[in-house]
Every structure is written in C-alpha cells, then in structure tokens.
Amino acid sequence: MRNEILDYFRKANGQFISGEQISRDLHVSRTAIWKHINILKERGYIFESSTRKGYRLIYAPNLLTPLEIDSALHTETFGRHVVYLSSTTSTNEEAKKIAREGAEEGTIVVAEEQTGGRGRLTRSFYCPFAKGIWFTLILRPKFFPLEASKCTLMAAVGVCRGIRRLGLQDAGIKWPNDILYHGKKLVGILTEMSASMEKIDYIIIGAGINTGMKKSEFPELFRESATSFLAEGIDVSRKDLLAAILAELEKEYEIAQTQGFDKVLEDWKALSLTLGQDVRVIMGEENYTGKAVDIDKDGCLLVDTGEKVERVIAGDVSIRPIDAPLPKR
C-alpha cells in the first residue's frame, strides 16, 4: 500500500490531494494514509500539508531505495525483491551470503556506496556514494554448470542495451564484459557462481555503472580511461537506468533459459567493440598480438595471430588495443 500511495502522489505532479480523495480512490482509511505518509517522511520524502487542501509530495530522495526502484520497474521477477544498503564492502559478497541462505532468483543487492568494489583479475573499481549504480543480481538457472560462463556475456548484453535505452547509443562491449563509451570504461561486470558437477546453486552478476561523476571526480588513475553518464552530458535517473537494465537482463535470461545461448551470443556480437580489432593478449608475463575475429560457442575469444588462431578464455587474460601501453608491474 505504501508504494501505491507514493505512486499516487507522483502522478499528481506536485499538486495537493485531499486525504478523503486518496482514501476513496485507494480504498484505505485516512488514518492508514497518515501513518504511511509519516513512514515515508522518515525515509527522506518531504510532504507539504494543508488543512484545506490535503498533502502534496515536494521531494523524493535521490536514493535507490526499494520504494524508488519499485516505482520504475517493468519486470516479472528481476528487482522485485531488493536488499538495500547505504554502504557495503561489496554487493557481490552480500549477495553470496543471502544466496547461500536461500534468497530467491531475481533478488538484487543495491548499495549507495561500495568501499571494496572489484572487477575481473581482482582490479579495483571506484564506487562513491550515490554517484553510480552498484548492484548484484542473484540467478538460480536450470542449465548445466558448463554453460555458466556464458552468463558473463549475457549480462554484458543486458546491461549494454539498458544503457543505450537511456541515451548512450554508442555504448558497446569490450570482450568479455566491460561496457565502454567512446573508448572509456562506463561499466564493470563481475560474474561469480556456486555449483556442483551436476547443478548450479546460484550465479551472481555484479555491475558497477558510473552515472553521476564529473571527470574531475574520478581518481587520477582512472580519469582518462573511465567515464560516466554525467561526464558525457546526461543527467540520468538512476532508478530508471536500473529498471531498464533489469528489464533487458530479464529478457536475455529468458532467451538463455528457453532457447539456449546461441541467440545471446549473436546479441553479444552485435554489440561488440572487440571483434574485428587488432588486440594485445596479456597472460601474466606473456603477451602476443593478433586480430579478434570471433567468439566460439563457449564465449571464448578467437584471436588470429597470423600463424594460428588462439582461443582466449575469459578470466585468464587482459585484452587491450594493440597500441595501448603494457600494464605496469
């Protein structure tokens, strides 16, 4: 009922609504309405009240609370259960904990801030308070564990499509799952799982999307290599962006569950920024160059070195443009 009352005020666009009208339209007592409004006030919403006119909503907090997320969702299950945290070390770690305790599929863990955000190969990821979307989605798929690695590509497709829907049409995927915009990193994705030989217990998909950081607010180490919606001139609604991403993820997941991953791999190729490019493959102290020509049925990158086609497995390597400097050691 609280969500319905909040949605009712949103649709009023700042106009006063009498308690009698709300009571009549939502079939709830005026006392209950008053109690719900007081709870909303405690959660950061600001209402103006008038003896003759009733109430009007004049401020909603720019936070990814369950109420805010729910108001924007268009999914069946993804995001319908939200674990909300003001700050955490890692949403992935929180998600693993509740997944082990039986959290249902589609549950998301959302934090306003991550103090220990990380990506592939244990790289750090900058996650300041309310300047991005830091979340993890819990899945309990029915396909075999050998297929689990393809969820990384599925996640990249869903996130990239959601980002394109909110204005950054040129966003694309750097193999396997970074989302770039005009060569700069916009999103990091980290997929982890728990499984036996026969069955997947859970898969978690963690994503960090830069939304509200100015270029000057990025740490110097990332200033030239990272970007955000705001740095690209778009003041995006975080709840609308998260809702779009969850909707696209749910679509891709449904395809993977019912049709297999062939369509998902096609979707990934259509969004790829890596295929057709000259790349450097870095494997510990070793590195070689070649052209990224395709991905195989398992999502591995195929790199033509001129002498042979190498099969590159995600998680073992770093892929960089051929003219990029080697990482410092």
Model-found features: residue ranges?
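N-terminal lobe of the biotin/lipoate ligase/transferase fold
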Residues: 2-165, 329
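Structural motif
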Residues: 81-82, 106-108, 133, 172, ...
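A short, compositionally biased micro-patch
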Residues: 50, 128, 174, 295-296
